[in-house]
Curated annotation (Swiss-Prot):
Keywords recorded for this protein, A-Z: ATP-binding, Cytoplasm, Hydrolase, Nucleotide-binding, Protease, Serine protease, Stress response
InterPro entries: AAA+_ATPase, ATPase_AAA_core, Lon_bac, Lon_bac/euk-typ, Lon_lid, Lon_proteolytic, Lon_Prtase, Lon_prtase_N
Gene name as annotated: lon4
Subcellular location: Cytoplasm
GO biological process, alphabetically ordered: cellular response to heat; protein quality control for misfolded or incompletely synthesized proteins
SUPFAM superfamilies: P-loop containing nucleoside triphosphate hydrolases, PUA domain-like, Ribosomal protein S5 domain 2-like
Protein's UniProt name: Lon protease 4
UniProt organism field: Sorangium cellulosum (strain So ce56)
Length: 799
């Protein structure tokens, strides 16, 4: 059995082995280390204080279960000084004794055991070793205070042999594991002393350099700026290293992102300037985060990234047909627009604007176009935006400034050629902070948006490849310059048959899925869907229809959840069952009841939520020929009433009106739903008809509605919104519609199935209106005319 330097016997092979992840135990030194690996803990449970074990360094500190090839060849026999339990494992104190050469690992469970032999050192020239040790001792006394180590204490107190003294000095230097292993593996004493002397000289030089750097930094910066000092130290170190390599820090990562962003020349120059500013300020500076956020926005924008665009028009048409019922003219115009984009390869075409009431599919059309063409789709909601900075961004001088919604949309899209939908453009407001609608003029102008400048970025960004789409409910709310930049595609609404088809193919499956109802558990008949459309909704779109179907599904889901046997019952909803699920009928066709007396006529109006019918009521009473007009009417509508009355008075004889009574009676014209503002010229024909009916005691036909502007000479002028108005008449159960002759061309836009159920009567003058709208025989005792109420809460109407 071999003897160790301490006089103890070397352990027999195989002996317990403790691998160290980092660091080296030198002979003659004491090491305290935490122990937590299961096999290392098992070793500590098997030994006691005073036992001798082997300690060896790992080549790879990340290796959890090292094998022979993962361990160095030279280790140290160590005496266990103390073992104590701590919160996260054990703490071991060991003392290095002698080197050993590792031969093999013979056991790995439950702990490591190894075979090895004592590795004796070779003294060589004893006098040379003594002189080298003395020199090393003096040098250690000098270097110790500079390096902040206990080298001076070791030099003063150690009486070890030259080889062990070299080990003690090497252990105190705090060297990397690789350099410590170079010393441990050197079995010749003289070369070991020489190697340690060189390492001590390097440590001294590094200490001098650090002192110089600290001095340079302190001369430039005041006391207490800890973070700035650390940063300046790093810069000074990099300066002394003259180009040394370093890992990628935050600044380097930001520089790399800017390099990869493909910035144009002007943006690149600004980014480089801001990068230099960022380098010159410390993280504690208020400007640091401002500059960094600005550079991150520049790096995140798609300056050159483009989506691969699919230009298959058949695919676009198929997608539109799949997701939208009807709207044939709308789809055709969309395809024409996409064809121009395909042929020119540019998005610098007129901006499409989908105009129509809520729920007709304006927003979803944009999504369908994006899906079919492969472009990312981004929606910007503009409803209620009153600040121009919401679109253009805030200038960086403001605290918390950020880019506007246009730049946000491009960042979200990650490409410079997305489809951007500007939703509810007509809901834009204006305030003392500027007009956001005016800011849209540059965005939507193909000649100007190539150099769009956001206030925050203050850099030109090319928007010419972006396909902008807009949606509005009321075109009249747009300014003339903005309206001029848009190509309007009107979506007037759906017919009852189209609504039923949409409900069957889209709304019902969607609600069944959302309510976790098996399609086989619920069946809604076509008659029930038709009744929902007729009796529970009165809209141009299908949004309310979707809510009613959702309500029905909730009621059915309750029945299924309450099923006693746990099996889902099959529910078939008939039209007669709707009262149980949806409550009382909400809408009735009361046109006949309202027009059953003279003096009441049915008109047609356009509102931002679609077409609607309105009633013009007139009454007369003893008086002095005065006229009262009520119903919250606008100036244009009041003038239409006066013009209609003037025509009646001037043609009283041919209309069968007693002129004497006109001077002795007051007239009252009222449009119900007085809480709703109304305006527009198209109620002129309806007011004339109501007045003529009142004064001639002839009822207006209950199945007839009308629209048109009248002149003092009795001409009927064209008006707008014909398709929406006719669809509203059809929804209300009207069978005959009187329209201006010059609106005959607009009848082509009305769906064929609606035209087949309506009689459209085109007129040029008032005499034709009277012939088409009034009954032949007068009624007895015309009285004071019919006055009935109207449903409140309807949207503002343009008559």
């Amino acid at each position: 059995m071999s003897q160790l330097r301490s006089g103890a016997s070397a352990p027999r092979s195989p002996f317990p082995l403790l691998p160290l992840r980092t660091g080296v135990l030198f002979p003659g030194t004491v090491l305290t280390l935490p122990v937590g690996r299961p096999r290392s803990v098992a070793l500590l449970n098997a030994v006691h204080a005073g036992d001798v074990i082997g300690v060896i360094a790992q080549r790879d500190p990340k290796r959890e279960d090292p094998r022979r090839e993962d361990l160095h060849d030279i280790g140290t026999f160590a005496r266990v000084v103390d073992i104590s339990r701590v919160s996260n494992g054990y703490r071991l104190v060991i003392e290095g004794l002698d080197r050993f050469a590792l031969s093999a690992l013979v056991e790995t469970e439950p702990t490591w055991r190894a075979e090895g032999t004592l590795a004796p050192e070779f003294l060589g020239d004893a006098e040379e070793a003594r002189l080298l040790a003395a020199s090393l001792r003096e040098r250690a006394r000098e270097v110790g205070p500079k390096t902040g180590t206990n080298l001076a204490e070791i030099a003063a107190t150690s009486r070890a042999e030259p080889g062990v003294f070299a080990d003690q000095v090497a252990g105190a230097l705090g060297l990397p594991t690789e350099k410590e292993m170079e010393v441990l593996s050197e079995l010749r004493v003289v070369p070991r002393l020489q190697r340690v002397a060189g390492l001590l000289a390097e440590a001294s030089a590094l200490a001098d350099l650090k002192k110089k750097i600290d001095g340079d930094v302190r001369r430039e910066l005041g006391k207490g700026q800890r973070e700035v000092i650390l940063r300046e130290q790093l810069r000074a170190i990099q300066k002394e290293l003259a180009g040394g390599e370093e890992g990628e820090d935050e600044l380097s990562a930001l520089r790399r992102r800017l390099d990869e962003a493909g910035l144009p020349e002007e943006a690149r120059a600004v980014a480089d300037r801001e990068l230099r500013r960022l380098e010159s300020v410390g993280p504690q500076s208020a400007e640091h985060n401002v500059i960094r956020t600005y550079l991150e926005w520049i790096a995140d924008l798609p300056w050159s990234a483009r989506a691969e665009v699919k230009d298959d028009l058949d695919a676009v048409k198929a997608k539109l047909d799949e997701e939208h019922r009807g709207l044939d003219d709308v789809k055709r115009r969309i395809l024409e627009h996409m064809a121009v984009l395909k042929l020119t390869g540019k998005a610098r075409a007129t901006i499409l604007c989908f105009a129509g009431p809520p729920g007709v599919g304006k927003t979803s059309l944009g999504q369908s176009i994006a899906d079919a063409t492969g472009r990312p789709f981004v929606r910007i909601s503009l409803g209620g935006v009153h600040d121009e900075a919401e679109l253009r961004g805030h200038r960086r001088t403001y605290v918390g400034a950020l880019p506007g919604r246009i730049v946000h949309a491009l960042k979200k899209a990650k490409v410079k050629n997305p489809i951007v939908l500007l939703d509810e453009v007509d809901k834009l407001g204006a305030g003392w902070r500027g007009s956001p609608e005016a800011a849209l003029l540059e965005v939507l102008d193909p000649e100007q948006n190539r150099t769009f400048v956001d206030h925050y970025l203050e850099l030109p960004f090319d928007l010419s490849e972006v396909v902008f789409l807009c949606t509005v409910n009321d075109l009249g709310a747009l300014s003339a310059p903005l309206r001029d930049r848009l190509e309007v595609i009107e979506l007037s609404g759906y017919t009852p048959d189209e609504k039923i088809a949409i409900a069957r193919s889209h709304l019902v499956p969607k609600q069944l899925k959302e309510h976790a109802i098996d399609p086989g558990s619920l069946s809604i008949t076509d008659e029930a869907l038709a009744a929902i459309v007729r009796d529970y909704t009165r809209e141009a779109g299908v949004r309310q229809l979707g809510r009613e179907i959702k309500k029905l599904c909730r009621a059915v889901a309750l029945e299924i959840a309450r099923a006693a046997d746990g099996k889902a019952p099959r529910v078939v909803v008939e039209a007669s069952d709707l009262g149980t699920y949806l409550g009382k009928v909400r809408f009735f066709s009361d046109v006949a009841e309202r027009t059953s007396v003279a003096g009441v006529a049915t008109g047609l109006a356009w509102t931002p939520v679609g077409g609607d019918i309105l009633f013009i009521e007139t009454s007369r009473m003893p008086g002095k020929g005065r006229v009262e007009i009520t119903g919250q009417l606008g100036d244009v509508m009041k003038e239409s009433a006066k013009a209609a009355l003037t025509y009646v008075r001037s043609h009283a004889i041919e209309l069968g009106v007693d002129t004497a009574k006109l001077e002795a009676e007051d007239l009252h014209i009222h449009v119900p739903a007085g809480g709703v503002p109304k305006d527009g010229p198209s109620a002129g024909v309806t007011m004339f008809t109501a007045l003529t009916s009142l004064l001639s005691a002839r009822r207006v036909r209950s199945d007839t509605a009308m629209t048109g502007e009248c002149t003092l000479r009795g001409r009927v002028l064209p008006v707008g919104g014909i398709k929406s108005k006719v669809l509203a008449a059809h929804r209300a159960g009207i069978k005959r519609v009187v329209l201006p002759q010059k609106n005959a061309r607009d009848a082509e836009e009305i769906p064929k199935e609606v035209r087949a159920e309506l009689e459209l009567i085109f007129v040029e003058d008032m005499s034709q209106v009277i012939a088409a709208a009034l009954e032949e025989a007068p009624i007895e005792a015309a009285g004071t005319g019919g006055v009935t109420g109207a449903a409140a809460g309807e949207p503002a109407a343009a008559a």
